[in-house]
Swiss-Prot record:
Keyword flag Protein biosynthesis: yes
Similarity-based family: Belongs to the phenylalanyl-tRNA synthetase beta subunit family. Type 1 subfamily.
UniProt-listed Gene3D superfamilies: 3.30.56.10, Bira Bifunctional Protein, Domain 2, Ferrodoxin-fold anticodon-binding domain, Nucleic acid-binding proteins, Phenylalanyl-trna Synthetase, Chain B, domain 3
Record-listed E.C. numbers: 6.1.1.20
Protein name from the UniProt record: Phenylalanine--tRNA ligase beta subunit
Binding partners and assembly: Tetramer of two alpha and two beta subunits.
Length: 790
């Protein structure tokens, strides 16, 4: 929130310098992002009055003006399009020094002498750009220093408030806070009730009291919108980051900054028969003040009349019901909208307004009538008019209940590490408007004021005590606690260990966004119902990833486009799946390889990566947890139908690997074969604890087996059959050759496999090996129709 320091000091003026005030506010938990002078240094600029304007004899776009400083008249050549006789403007006389040490001197412009310069907001450093002279109020005293008249030695303070401190989104809230910090008695300025001059009321009906517990309105007839907004109000709004629009809108914005209550003004003559606060009808549309047409979501509260929607409640008004220069009668709205009903509504339409910012966090539900009286007072002063009586619709059962919070005196001392007597604690909290509801032997029950939505439990009160006491005054003590070192179970496999292993095999870690392109996800996981964002950062970041491949493939494309011919990447992170109406978050580990299998070198042969490279990497990786690992052929929509496998642990699927489907590779502009894997980390987080086995001193016995089987039979099935039939003394078996040719027949292949046996306590007999070998041959024949190769 931005505000003028002078404006704040009109409400409460502590005896502190600007720097000390900013530091105090920050140390109280209201972080000041910036505090800047309203205008950069300049001197010699006074309020001038333009007496006459004549055309320049030799330049169409220049004017020759007579300007008075209250004592003398000066001839000034001016090119501003809005210069006019009778207006009052900042006048830089000869000798004035503008920002940047630019000194005003007597000059001739196209042959006509100019004795000074008429200034715009840009020249006064009040704006980055301006289209013409800065008009001053008609009652501005001629000859007075502009810096003094506009109070340009003021500071703009920008406070970055946390969402729980919505009570400080106003001058009233900041003044309350500063008064409490400096022990200054504070009473908000009284707002007098304006008596009704006319009997006109506008019917109001609230159909959703749970979303709008209080609605206050008032008719004011006969307003004059041609009346200018006073200079003091324009300046206060500008220093709060709000541009002046017209007197009515400026007043509602002013009250919002002053009291924290957003308001809206409707053109009464554009409304049909009454105000209705309701939920929208299906498909209802509204053109907003910014010209954007929207279809109103079913959960969005609207302000309507009896024919059409007028505004998104608490967010933005509609284009056709706002005030204009033709408006003569207005209907003022001041309402309390429940924060939970407004949370996220503005963002769902891609909007963020000052009103929605306040309503989402919570406004004081007791201030709506006060705000409308303050706005009435200002409007009658500026645009005139005849006010009607105030209309108020209130559903007390739906208003927030005042929080009653218990506070133990001993707990205050315990958490803060400093002893504060009971009287001091009571006095501190009283300064913040917290009343003692009940006194007990060990503490109190406090009632929170209506503007503090963030106070609900004991630690909230202790935080307030700490803020007023001063965080910087709290003693610093080292925590004392037994810190026994508890080693992790040996079976636990850390993610860091897995990452380091992949790095040792030439992979590089990538970190990509969780939000990805919906189109990419529809290619990779078309069967999954993706989670989409209502208001994404960008159109290609609108969905939450269902696989880590989405980000890795984009990273691979980025590297490919930069002439990288060997890419090996991995990433760990969450994937997001819809399961039974809930969002399931699974920690995953994924990787990809493409390009050359080895870095280019004089002794390495050039070879492109293949399926067995990524399979070998996975086998090596999964040796860390000691998995009972196996693979089986599978199908995946993102992978090549003939080069896809499931990764199994103890027979249960834990991941998938394979070649990227050529169709997807072409769509994503990825060149050459690319191989991927993805594992569920939870499935490999618990490994097997290694157990010692003595090395047998007896010899190994190896037998080689060459069989002919169908081309389509995967070796993984053959390997499993060998393991199951070779007997208990089998140590291992390896495939060492694959042959295709006329000698084995069409649609056949020959597999050459070595099988090794060894007994831990004796030498195996030849007949035992022969029996085991024959069992293997028999099992392969029965299961796959395999025959020994002749």
């Amino acid at each position: 929130m931005k505000f003028s320091e002078y404006w704040l000091r009109e409400w409460v003026d502590p005896q502190l310098s600007s720097e000390a005030l900013v530091q105090q506010i920050t140390m109280a938990g209201l972080e000041v992002d910036a505090a800047e002078r309203v205008a950069k240094p300049f001197s010699g600029i006074v309020v001038g009055e333009v007496l006459s304007v004549e055309p320049h004899p030799d330049a169409d776009k220049l004017r020759v003006c007579k300007v008075s400083d209250g004592q003398e008249e000066f001839q000034v050549v001016c090119g501003a399009p809005n210069v006019a006789a009778g207006m009052k403007v900042p006048f830089a006389k000869i000798g004035a020094v503008l920002s940047g040490d630019f000194k005003i001197k007597k000059a001739k412009l196209r042959g006509v002498e100019s004795q000074g310069m008429l200034c715009s907001e840009e020249e006064l450093t009040l704006a980055e750009k301006s289209d013409g002279l800065m008009p001053l109020a008609a009652d501005a005293p001629v000859g007075v220093d502009v810096r003094s008249y506009l109070k340009l030695d003021d500071n703009i303070i920008d406070v970055d408030l946390t969402p729980n401190r919505s009570d400080c989104l106003s001058i009233l809230g900041m003044a309350r806070e500063v008064a409490a910090l400096n022990k200054i008695p504070f009473e908000a300025p009284e707002v007098k009730k304006t008596a009704a001059v006319i009997d006109d009321v506008f019917p109001v009906r609230v159909e959703a009291p749970e979303a709008c517990p209080r609605y206050v309105g008032r008719v004011i007839k006969g307003v004059d919108l041609s009346a200018p907004t006073p200079q003091w109000m324009v300046e206060k709004l500008r220093r709060s980051g709000i541009r002046s629009i017209d007197a009515v809108v400026d007043v509602t914005n002013f009250v919002m900054i002053e009291l924290g209550q957003p308001m809206h003004a409707f053109d009464l003559n554009e409304l049909a028969d009454g105000i209705v606060v309701r939920m929208p009808t299906p498909g209802e549309k509204l053109v907003l003040l910014d010209g954007q047409e929207i279809t109103i979501n079913p959960d969005t509260l609207v302000i309507a009349d009896n024919e059409k929607p007028l505004a998104l409640a608490g967010v933005m008004g509609g284009e056709h019901s706002g005030v204009s220069e033709k408006t003569k009668d207005i209907f003022l709205e001041s309402a309390f909208f429940a924060p939970l009903h407004l949370a996220g509504k503005a963002r769902s339409y891609g909007l963020h307004t000052d009103s929605s910012h306040r309503f989402e966090r919570g406004v004081d539900y007791a201030h709506q009538a006060r705000a409308i009286e303050r706005a009435t007072e200002l409007l009658l002063e500026i645009v005139g008019g005849q006010p009607g009586p105030v209309t108020e619709i209130c559903s007390k059962e739906h208003l927030p209940a005042k929080a009653l919070v218990n506070l133990r005196h001993a707990r205050v001392d315990e958490l803060l590490g400093v002893h504060l007597d009971r009287t001091r604690v009571e006095e501190m909290l009283a300064r913040l408007g917290l009343g003692v509801h009940k006194v007990a032997k060990d503490g109190w029950t406090f009632s929170a004021p209506t503007h503090r939505f963030d106070i609900s439990i004991e630690v909230d009160l202790i935080e307030e005590v700490a803020r007023l006491y001063g965080y910087n005054k709290l003693p610093v003590t080292e925590p004392m606690a037994p810190l026994g070192i508890k080693p992790l179970p040996e079976s636990k496999v850390s993610l860091r260990r897995l990452k380091l292993h992949l790095v040792s095999r030439g992979y590089q870690e990538a970190i990509t966004y969780t939000f990805v392109d919906q189109k990419v996800l529809s290619l990779l996981t078309p069967e999954e119902d993706t989670i989409t964002l209502a208001n994404p950062i960008a159109s290609d970041m609108a969905a939450m990833r269902t696989t880590l491949w989405a980000g890795l493939l984009q990273t691979a494309l980025y590297n490919q486009n930069r002439q990288q011919n060997r890419i090996r990447l991995f990433e760990s992170g969450l994937r997001f799946l819809k399961r039974g109406g809930q969002i399931q978050q699974d920690p995953m580990l994924a990787g990809l390889i493409m390009g050359a299998s080895m870095p280019e070198g004089w002794e390495s042969k050039k070879r492109t990566v293949d399926f067995y490279d990524v399979k070998g990497d996975l086998e090596s990786l999964l040796e860390i947890p000691g998995c009972n690992l196996s693979f089986r052929s599978a199908q995946h929509p993102a992978l090549h139908p003939g080069q896809t496998a499931e990764v199994l642990k103890d027979g249960q699927p834990i991941g998938v690997l394979g070649a990227l489907h050529p169709r997807i590779a072409k769509t994503l502009n990825l060149n050459g074969p690319l191989y991927l894997f993805e594992l569920c980390l939870n499935s490999i987080a618990d490994g097997q604890v290694p157990s010692f086995k003595g090395v047998s001193r007896f010899p190994e016995i190896r037998r080689d087996l060459a069989i002919v089987i169908d081309e389509q039979t995967p070796y993984a099935d053959v390997a499993l059959a060998i393991a199951q039939s070779a007997g208990e003394w089998r140590v291992h078996h390896e495939l060492f050759d694959v042959y295709h040719g006329e000698s084995v027949g069409a649609d056949k292949k020959s597999l050459a496999i070595s099988i090794v046996w060894r007994h831990p306590e004796r030498t195996l007999r030849d007949e035992e090996i022969t029996e085991a070998f024959d069992n293997v041959v028999k099992e392969l024949g029965n299961r796959f129709g395999a025959s020994l190769r002749s």
